Each structure stands twice: as structure tokens, then as C-alpha cells.
């Protein structure tokens, strides 16, 4: 197969590093924080994860696009990643579920992307210097000077509240479960078969989190990020779920206030990723920006109570500071990569959080039993 003519593209980092390659997405420009993800598969799930808003994602696996794309693998209604960086795009996408090639998918979603660069060199820079502000410039008139100027214009994620930007604007009900191989679909479960009612705060929720809850018997009501606690509690939930999301948790004062009000009740609370960080802030801890963050599907995490080590999917650039935990908040999990805090639990309430992604998508589901723990916490209320 003859390789088609390509459009030039440039990736510039704020430190002055320049990478020339070819465009595989939309023409134009994009700026954001450049991070690297070590997952070998799941590029469509990564692109559509709202937690990647304002981030340009570098995939360290060299061949990306082999299996094309399918609507069934999307984790939200659009691509949220600010841009994509890869080493090599295969000429053919081959998979029985493939509906659209990766380049066509990127163009349809107006996503700027670059291929043909040395991603190993780029990853070393990001690993040694930390996440960098950057720019991808795609088009025949792209220049290094312009790309560098744009890269340095990005203010960074510190202090940036993105949860309210990616959140839904109106509440909705979710009853779709995990993918069924026989029907090749995500089946919709009748409300009569879902005994638990969970209210989920959407700070950038992934579809597979909602599916995991439904698969365990939950009818889920998804609320906008800025919904007051009074409105959430008026729905008479059996449990409150705090979703994942992008950006810095500290500016999300509306969410912190709402969680504090929820914690005044006896309703079980479970937080993932940004939701975990917001639970920590609402309980009196502080959060910090990490040098490189955790982005991948192979991160070992240890359960501090049992000693069990689990391989987890991770995607975060901020974390709760363990040294700041108040007396009523204890550490439950730690990263074996860098020792950062991965799990917390209130000692005075039925409330806990996990920094990684138990729902995976992509990645392993070693930590999925945390969903079962949430169900068990709600069971006494439902059984009464």
C-alpha cells in the first residue's frame, strides 16, 4: 500500500525542545500539558477520558492505530485530550470491531495529532524534567518559532478548575451495563432490576465507571459538578459517588462544600481519581501537583492493610498529601512506583477514595472489588 501524502506538524515544549513529524489529525494548533501514557492498548479510551482535558497525550507504545476505532470503546461523548503524540501510525487498521481509522476519528473530533517523532526521547524529557507545557502545530505553514511561542503561552494546570467545564449541564439517568459479547452491546437494565440508587457527581465521569455500578445493581443518577448537596440529597440516594475528572482539585470549592455537606449524613461515599482528591480536601487534607503524574495501565499499588499488590490503571497529575491527613482520615493504599498516596478512608464515616481507576478501560481490573465494597456499604440501608 502506498503511503499517502502527509501534512507537516511540529511539537514544541516550553523548555525549547522541538520535534518535527507529520499530522495525523486535524490541521491547526493545540496547547496543553504534555504527559506520557505507558498503556500498550486502549488509545480510544484514553483520548475520550475527560480527565485528559487540556493535556497532550504521548503514547509510549510505538504502534498506535492498529485496531481503528469503534463507538463502543468511547469513554465519553467526545475526544477530551488536547492532542495526541505517537511514534508510528500503521497503514492499515484491522479489527472486526473497527468502524473508523484513527486519523479519520481524530479529524472528525477536531483533534490535532502528530506522528513520526522520537517518543522515547520525548518521554525521557518528561520523565526527567516533569510534565511540560507544549504545543502541536499542524499545517503547511507551521513554524518552530510559532509552536514554541504557543507552548509557552499555556498557563499550566495548577489552579485550573476543569471539572465544571467537562461536566454535564443537566442531570440524567444511566442504566447501561458492561459490554455483552453475545449481543455485541452494552445492555440497558430495567430499573426494576436495580435495587440501589447511586447519585454520581460528574467531574468528568467515564462511561465504564457507570457501567460498573449498573453491573452491580445500581440505578445511577448523574449530576452536574456544581449541583448543591441539598439537590443531591433530595433524590434520596443510597450512596454518593464522586467521579474522576481533570485539572486541579483545589479550586473546585463548590464540590468541596457539597461533599462536606454530604459527609454530615450517614450516606456511603466513594470517590475515584479527582473525586478521591476532593474527598481528601473536604476532610481537611491538602493536594499537591506531581512532577510527572501517573498515566498508564501497569502501576503497582499496595493495600496497606492486607499487603496485597494490585496492578492498576492510573491517570492523574495531582495527589493528596499523606503528611496532611487529619486524624479522621487514614491511608489505605500506596503506589509502589513512588510511594504516593493511592487510597484513603474516613474513620468516622462510611467514605473512602481511590486515586487510580478501578474501572480500568483501559487496563487491569485488580481494584474493581472497591465497587463491591461500595455496594456492601449501601446494602444495610437498602435492606431495611
From Swiss-Prot:
Residues 1-193 are annotated as: CPSase. GO terms for biological process: 'de novo' pyrimidine nucleobase biosynthetic process; 'de novo' UMP biosynthetic process; glutamine metabolic process; L-arginine biosynthetic process. The active site is at 273 (nucleophile), 357, 359. Composed of two chains; the small (or glutamine) chain promotes the hydrolysis of glutamine to ammonia, which is used by the large (or ammonia) chain to synthesize carbamoyl phosphate. Tetramer of heterodimers (alpha,beta)4. Pfam families: CPSase_sm_chain (PF00988), GATase (PF00117). The gene is carA. Pathway: Amino-acid biosynthesis; L-arginine biosynthesis; carbamoyl phosphate from bicarbonate: step 1/1; Pyrimidine metabolism; UMP biosynthesis via de novo pathway; (S)-dihydroorotate from bicarbonate: step 1/3. The keyword Transcription does not apply. This is Carbamoyl phosphate synthase small chain. L-glutamine binds at residues 51, 245, 247, 274, 277, 315, 317-318. GO terms for molecular function: ATP binding; carbamoyl-phosphate synthase (glutamine-hydrolyzing) activity; glutaminase activity. The keyword GTP-binding does not apply. Residues 197-384 form the Glutamine amidotransferase type-1 domain.
